[in-house]
């Protein structure tokens, strides 16, 4: 998975932060003012994100409203997964990552690992 470009990332941050589906005009208005971006530029990048599956859309009169199809966590997990493909020692890389986590993060990871292990042990219905 390739990381978002600068404008893709800025648009996704706006959409992820929006409490409800948002129009292209609303996205453009919430982007940082510098550099100034043309409406059509924002529209093109929003359409690219829609075609990539990151945004969903619904018609609202003459406009579309956009909402995230995938979460920030999905994006981060994809980047981490991609990073792990670049090493021959995935375990070592994961252990170094765990070494940077605080106690609450380690506890959450431990709970997720315990749940995943329990799911694998449970016979399928």
Task: Outline where the language-model segments fall.
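Pre-recognition alpha-helix immediately N-terminal to the DNA-recognition helix
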Residues: 9-14, 26
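Amphipathic alpha-helical dimerization/coiled-coil segments
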Residues: 78-120
């Amino acid at each position: 998975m390739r990381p978002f470009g600068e404008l893709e990332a800025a648009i996704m941050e706006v959409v992820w932060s929006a409490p409800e589906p948002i129009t292209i005009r609303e996205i453009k208005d919430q982007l940082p003012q510098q550099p100034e971006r043309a409406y059509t530029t924002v529209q093109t990048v929003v359409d690219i994100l829609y075609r990539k599956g990151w945004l969903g859309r619904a018609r609202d009169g003459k406009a579309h409203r956009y909402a995230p199809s995938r979460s920030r966590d999905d994006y981060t997990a994809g980047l981490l997964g991609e990073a792990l493909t670049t090493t021959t020692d995935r375990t070592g890389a994961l252990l170094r990552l765990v070494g940077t986590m605080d106690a609450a993060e380690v506890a959450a990871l431990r709970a997720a690992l315990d749940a995943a292990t329990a799911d694998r042990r449970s016979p399928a219905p």
